[in-house]
């Protein structure tokens, strides 16, 4: 258990929790006492869950396409079903699909990049906002 318990008994949604920064953030907030909702489309999110559980942490996974509002709503609904509230949303999902100079991107590739990196943040904020306003978070 970490000395810093700033997330003790807080329900925290972490998007993009399967890999990279999102995985690291999820592990850290769990280590600091959070009840973590691990949101990702990838099956690798199960590995993040297993690591948290191995350290006696409290977490669930929600596999959802966060490029859609329905996917974001599914994450919020599951968090509320299991934990009854949401205290913190950490929007992390996104990242480059193609690594090349921007001038080489086609219009379709730019649209896919925006869909992957911008819309998940917007949809998750929109989905969680009514609950956070209600609970003055």
Located regions from the model:
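A short helix-coil junction within the Rossmann-fold of NAD(P)-dependent oxidoreductases
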Residues: 32, 82-83, 100, 127-136
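Active-site loop of short-chain dehydrogenase/reductase
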Residues: 10, 57-58, 85-86, 132-137
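The beta1-alpha1 cofactor-binding region of Rossmann-like NAD(H)/NADP(H)-dependent oxidoreductases
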Residues: 63-75, 107
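Canonical Rossmann dinucleotide-binding motif of NAD(H)/NADP(H)-dependent dehydrogenases/reductases
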Residues: 5-37
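Hydrophobic positions on the long internal alpha-helix
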Residues: 75, 90, 120, 124-128
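Conserved catalytic-site loops of classical short-chain dehydrogenases/reductases
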Residues: 87-88, 111
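Catalytic Tyr-X3-Lys loop
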Residues: 103-123, 137
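Conserved NAD(P)H cofactor-binding loop of Rossmann-fold oxidoreductase domains
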Residues: 93-98
């Amino acid at each position: 258990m970490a000395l810093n318990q700033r997330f003790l008994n807080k329900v925290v949604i972490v998007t993009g929790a399967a890999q990279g920064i999102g995985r690291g953030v999820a592990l850290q907030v769990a280590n600091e006492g959070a009840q973590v909702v691990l949101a990702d489309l990838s099956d690798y999110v199960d590995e993040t869950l297993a690591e948290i559980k191995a350290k006696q942490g409290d977490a669930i996974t929600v596999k959802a396409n966060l490029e859609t509002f329905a996917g974001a709503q599914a994450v919020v609904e599951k968090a509320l079903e299991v934990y009854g509230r949401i205290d913190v949303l950490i929007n992390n999902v996104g990242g480059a699909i193609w690594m090349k100079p921007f001038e080489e991107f086609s219009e379709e590739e730019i649209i896919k990049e925006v869909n992957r990196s911008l819309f998940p943040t917007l949809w998750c904020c929109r989905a969680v906002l009514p609950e956070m306003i209600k609970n003055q978070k």
